[in-house]
A protein has these predicted regions:
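A short beta-strand-turn-helix
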Residues: 24-41, 71
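Hydrophobic beta-strand anchors of alpha/beta hydrolase catalytic cores
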Residues: 42-43, 77, 114
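Solvent-exposed loop/turn segments at secondary-structure junctions
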Residues: 48-51, 61, 82-86, 109, ...
Length: 146
């Protein structure tokens, strides 16, 4: 009985891990991938442990297999997280990088704030949180490109 429980827990953990959004956390790396693959960048400013709309956006859009299937060959996903809890503190270098991204792309400090960039980092448009489906949110991101 214990063995079956442990096996089911491992499988459950793997299923959550397999469906996680693949995030890049460095703008230069995102630009390089975007340029190589002829893709645009979706830059997401979020407060992963304090911003309720950010958490909803992650749960309802980014973490869904539906959105991931639609976006994986179309966008490079770049995350700039600003957690507040001590246990979620980012490494200093990453925090400095995120602060620079915020100065450049989110000077008003909106959370969540989704910015679509071209492969060289030019802003094409932006979105915030809205209650919608992963497919409709994806279509809004694509519409920004056009």
């Amino acid at each position: 009985m214990k063995k079956a429980f442990y096996i089911s827990m491992v499988l459950l953990t793997l299923s959550f891990t397999a469906s996680a959004q693949e995030w890049i956390t460095n703008l230069d790396e995102a630009k390089q991938i975007a340029s190589k693959n002829n893709q645009n960048i979706v830059l997401v400013f979020q407060g992963s442990d304090w911003c309720v709309p950010c958490i909803k956006l992650d749960k309802e859009i980014w973490s869904t297999s539906e959105f991931q299937k639609l976006s994986k060959d179309h966008f490079v996903m770049l995350q700039a997280d600003f957690p507040k809890r001590k246990q979620n503190k980012l490494p200093e270098e990453l925090q400095e990088h995120n602060n620079k991204l915020a100065q450049q792309y989110n000077p008003n400090g909106y959370f969540p704030f989704v910015v679509v960039l071209n492969e060289s980092g030019k802003v094409l448009g932006h979105l915030g949180y809205e209650k919608t489906t992963p497919t409709l949110f994806y279509k809004k991101l694509v519409a920004i490109e056009n």
